[in-house]
Design a protein with these regions (language model features):
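Glycine- and acidic
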Residues: 7-13, 63, 242-247
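Charged catalytic carboxylate motif
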Residues: 22-25, 76, 198, 259
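Short, solvent-exposed loop/turn segments at secondary-structure junctions
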Residues: 48, 100-101, 201-204
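Helical scaffold of the NTase/Pol beta-like nucleotidyltransferase catalytic core
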Residues: 1-42, 72-73, 275
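Catalytic metal-binding acidic patch
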Residues: 41-79, 90-97
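Conserved NTP/Mg2+-binding pocket subregion across the NTase superfamily
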Residues: 2-12, 79-187, 196
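Conserved nucleotidyltransferase catalytic core and NTase-mimicking acidic/glycine-rich helix/loop elements
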Residues: 132-275
Length: 275
């Protein structure tokens, strides 16, 4: 992971042959937009862990800047993301200034965000010459930064551990654990394969302290006989590998409810002090 591109982009050499050059070019474009105010660009998520599935996974990035983005930079980033993020390679990126990164707070404040879920609002804002209102904080950033430290990559700029402070375990767990069985079940119904695999990943972390990908979590749960419903977990893994992670049809409601109940109880016990 040490090869560098013309602007010092690194961490690309073991990525899929078509994605590495594409990502290098995109990071270079980010650097040109931010200029001297750039602290770094960081990759986390499935592309960093080697479990990226085309048509299902996002390219997950964090952008670190010295100061908040200017109005011109926001416009340039919006236009860049509307052009470069595609259904084949969807980008999710959050930009955080130094004041938003340190001291650490949860939920974490951020400066700017783009994902495909924001595409329509961003496109509408471009047409109107306005900027869409975004939340001031994002609780998911505790999970993103934790995964960056554990399994992510510095693509450009400061090392990740210099750009981002460590995230307390309690904040990470608060960002990823459903508050109750009903909330967990709602996630499973909305995205069954994603929800089942994510529960396996959280179970692996809670029991072993290791942060893995969704695929790694499922394989651990099956190998250690920790999956409440092994057949359900295997189906979720197959759906994930096939790029069918968001398919909602044909899942047994009773099995999803049992999965939500058993994982919620176990994770609640494991995340408690001394668990």
């Amino acid at each position: 992971m040490g090869e560098r591109g013309p602007l010092g982009v690194q961490g690309l050499d073991d990525l899929p042959a078509d994605i590495g050059p594409w990502l290098e070019g995109f990071v270079q474009q980010l650097a040109l937009v931010i200029g001297d105010g750039l602290d770094g660009v960081y990759l986390h998520g499935s592309l960093a862990t080697g479990d990226f599935v085309r048509g299902s996974s996002d390219v997950d990035l964090l952008l670190a800047t010295r100061e908040p983005l200017t109005a011109a930079q926001r416009v340039a980033l919006r236009d860049l993301l509307l052009e470069r993020s595609t259904p084949r390679l969807p980008i999710e990126i959050s930009s955080l200034s130094r004041a938003e990164r340190r001291p650490w707070r949860h939920p974490c404040p951020f400066d700017w965000h783009f994902s495909e879920a924001w595409r329509d609002r961003m496109a509408a804002s471009r047409a109107l010459g306005t900027e869409p209102a975004q939340p001031a904080t994002d609780p998911d950033l505790a999970a993103h930064v934790t995964m960056l430290h554990a399994r992510g990559r510095t693509l450009l700029g400061l090392p990740a551990d210099e750009a981002f402070p460590p995230v307390p375990r309690t904040d990470f767990l608060a960002s990823v654990l459903a508050p109750d069985v009903a909330a967990c079940l709602a996630t499973l119904r909305d995205a069954p394969a994603y929800g089942v695999l994510n529960l396996c990943r959280l179970g692996m972390y809670a029991r072993t302290g290791r942060l893995g990908s969704k695929r790694e979590g499922a394989l651990w749960a099956l190998a250690e006989a920790r999956a409440p419903l092994p057949a359900l977990t295997r189906r979720a893994l197959s759906a994930y590998d096939a790029g069918d992670e968001d398919e909602r049809r044909g899942w047994d409601a009773a099995e999803l409810a049992a999965c939500a109940r058993q994982w919620t109880d176990e994770l609640k016990d494991l995340s408690a002090p001394g668990g």
